[in-house]
From Swiss-Prot:
Essential for acetoin catabolism. It comes from Cupriavidus necator (strain ATCC 17699 / DSM 428 / KCTC 22496 / NCIMB 10442 / H16 / Stanier 337). Keywords: Acetoin catabolism, Cell membrane, Membrane. GO terms for cellular component: plasma membrane. It is found in: Cell membrane. Signal peptide: none annotated. InterPro entries: AcoX-like (IPR039065), AcoX_kinase (IPR011391), ATP-NAD_kinase_N (IPR017438), NAD/diacylglycerol_kinase_sf (IPR016064), NADK (IPR002504). GO terms for molecular function: ATP binding; NAD binding; NAD+ kinase activity. The keyword Glycosyltransferase does not apply. GO terms for biological process: acetoin catabolic process; NADP biosynthetic process. Pathway: Ketone degradation; acetoin degradation. This is Acetoin catabolism protein X.
Length: 359
């Protein structure tokens, strides 16, 4: 459908939407001065996406089901036959169990890729986008930030994201102009028996001295041992901001950054960074170096926790070996800015005036 599997554009492409109904509700919102996105706000975002997709000729959207009320509230709007909510694409929901855990996002991304969607629009923070990328394969994603940490998804009006995605999905912008390559961090933990565990991060992998996962969100900087980033934006919020304010690395630039942290008073210098909205923390920096594509970097810490894109995920012990490897060109995303420039330069949103109705 659309550009899926490299095929030429078809008449009725399908776009997937994965909206995390509970993003931006973790402990970082409690300890910092940050708001949570309400359910009605999420519904309004989806409606704006649908309106933009409809204007591009997308007639069908596939969504992840939920049990938080988003589906019910959205259905009320879609049932209207008049007004701004009329004429929107048909919304179908995946036939899948709902657990209200990250498993839903993983399963939905996998099902949408299997269904041949042209693209997947993701509403969530870094953790939600990471889960989608794990399972979406070659399907490009369009990120929309609705989480606490939003270093990966850029801040944009949903209508514009919907337009860019719709123009690509319907074949009006070719992949060479519409898509961008993104970096990824691969984390591998090998044990003494030859077994291994593997996971990914889109933005940052952080090593903590802690030994229990507990609350998944990581925000206490005095427990940090090392920070690895695929890119580092000095305007970002979250653990990647440490790298962004130390040595910025562009998201399209090759390579990443590895930072070793020290105990208080023992680093080369202290760095103040915004770890969560409204939460400024100081971290002692011991040293840093660039990460090169495809070259594994061995973690020095003997035991602890690996947090991926801000959330504790993996525990390791003294008999384990942990490596972090950066990969350039790991997955594709909709380049919204490039799509909109292409649309303007090639007059994609123009049409001839329709004759006025007589009588």
């Amino acid at each position: 459908m659309g550009h899926a599997a490299g095929a030429s554009a078809q008449i009725a492409p399908v776009v997937g939407i994965i909206a995390n109904p509970i993003s931006a509700r973790d402990i970082r919102r409690v300890i910092a001065n940050a708001n949570s996105l309400q359910l009605a706000d999420r519904v309004n975002i989806v409606l704006r996406l649908l309106a933009a997709l409809a204007s591009c000729g997308v007639e069908r959207v596939l969504m992840m089901p939920d049990r938080e009320g988003l589906r019910v509230m959205l259905a009320r709007h879609l049932a209207r036959r008049q007004g701004p909510d009329s004429g929107l694409p048909a919304v179908d929901y995946l036939d899948m169990p709902v657990t209200a855990r990250v498993d839903d996002t993983l399963r939905a991304a996998r099902c949408m890729a299997d269904a041949g969607v042209a693209a997947i629009i993701v509403l969530g923070g870094d953790g939600t986008h990471r889960a989608v990328v794990r399972e979406c394969g070659a399907v490009p994603i369009a990120g929309l930030s609705t989480g606490t940490n939003n270093a990966y998804p850029e801040m944009r009006e949903p209508t514009i994201i919907g337009l860019a995605t719709g123009l690509y999905a319907t074949g009006r912008i070719p992949p060479a102009q519409a898509l961008a390559s993104n970096k990824r961090l691969d984390i591998v933990i090998r044990d003494g028996n030859g077994g291994f565990r593997r996971d990914i991060a889109l933005v940052d992998a952080v090593i903590s001295h802690e030994h229990f996962i507990g609350a998944r969100a990581l925000w206490k900087t005095d427990t940090l041992a090392a920070v690895y980033v695929s890119f580092a934006d000095p305007e970002a919020i979250g653990l990647s901001s440490i790298a962004g304010l130390l040595e910025p690395v562009g998201r399209r630039e090759e390579g990443g950054l590895a930072i070793e942290l020290a105990a208080p008073g023992e680093g080369e210098f202290d760095l103040c960074a915004p770890i969560a909205p409204g939460l400024m923390c100081t971290v002692p920096v011991a040293g840093w170096q660039r990460l090169e594509h495809g070259r594994p970097h061995r973690v020095r810490q003997r035991s602890g926790i690996v947090a991926l894109d801000g959330e504790r995920e993996l525990a390791f012990g003294p008999d384990d070996e942990v490596t972090v490897t950066l990969h350039d060109h790991a997955f594709r995303s909709i380049d919204v800015a490039a799509c909109m420039r292409h649309a303007g330069r090639h007059h994609l949103m123009r049409s001839l005036p329709q004759p006025a109705a007589v009588g």
